[in-house]
């Protein structure tokens, strides 16, 4: 698969540019968005989510500008695996919410504000996709990692935590641009978060209906076969992961 954005740093806003990694799949869409944050006129930059340990992609990131900091939205390999090589290549620290991912830097804290490379970057802890998922607020924009994608919906570990994260994002100012970990930019992240909330409530209603039909001890696979009968079977494995999170959520109510 080819894509015109592979290998090309694309300016999205005065502060943010994106380099699309060539790792397309049903889960990553066209590939991982590696974000380069750079204040106008600044000599250095911040890189968010270097992606896989893909040397051509990482070498392009390393060549953009001196790198002051590498940030990770979460631990999944399509976002984080390239961080150690890039950190060594550009002599920059790595920071993430999960301390085990950090290199020469402290773990990120919820609501922390980072002052780096002429930027003020706010840390929003947005768990649900993973426990360590964070979003970054830079100026009027928010980098969402896999918490909200540019297209479609994300896979969940913890639905209760995820609904809380969506409610936080749903209170952002109207028209806040969203810069996701996969897929195109979102013109209004608040509106998208509210759409995600409505979608999750709809899915929960479907799962409740499936449990009424199948019985309270139905397995995630049985629920997927009923609720996702009209969905491509290639997506049933991630759907089963999300249904498991929904069942766990419903069984704690």
Model region roles, listed by residue range:
Residues 23-31, 45, 50-122:
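Active-site HxH/HxHxD metal-binding segment of metal-dependent hydrolases
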């Amino acid at each position: 698969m080819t894509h015109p954005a592979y290998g090309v740093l694309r300016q999205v806003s005065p502060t943010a540019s994106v380099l699309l990694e060539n790792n397309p799949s049903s889960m990553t869409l066209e590939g991982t968005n590696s974000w380069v944050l750079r204040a106008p006129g600044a000599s250095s930059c911040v890189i968010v989510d270097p992606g896989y340990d893909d040397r051509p992609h990482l070498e392009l990131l390393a060549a953009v500008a001196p790198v002051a900091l590498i940030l990770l939205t979460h631990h999944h390999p399509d976002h984080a695996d390239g961080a150690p090589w890039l950190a060594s290549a550009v002599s920059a620290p790595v920071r993430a919410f999960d301390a085990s991912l950090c290199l020469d830097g402290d773990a990120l804290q919820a609501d922390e504000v980072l002052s780096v490379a002429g930027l003020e970057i706010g840390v929003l802890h947005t768990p649900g996709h993973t426990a360590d998922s964070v979003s970054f607020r830079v100026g009027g924009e928010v980098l969402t990692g896999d918490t909200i994608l540019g297209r479609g919906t994300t896979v969940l570990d913890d639905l209760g935590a995820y609904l809380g994260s969506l409610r936080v994002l749903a209170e952002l100012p109207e028209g806040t641009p969203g810069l996701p970990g996969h897929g195109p930019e979102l013109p209004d992240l608040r509106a998208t978060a509210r759409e995600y909330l409505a979608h999750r409530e709809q899915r929960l209603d479907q799962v409740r209906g499936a449990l009424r039909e199948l019985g309270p001890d139905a397995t995630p696979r049985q629920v997927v076969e009923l609720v996702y009968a009209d969905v491509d079977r290639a997506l049933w494995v991630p759907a089963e992961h999300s249904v498991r999170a929904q069942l766990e959520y419903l069984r704690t109510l």
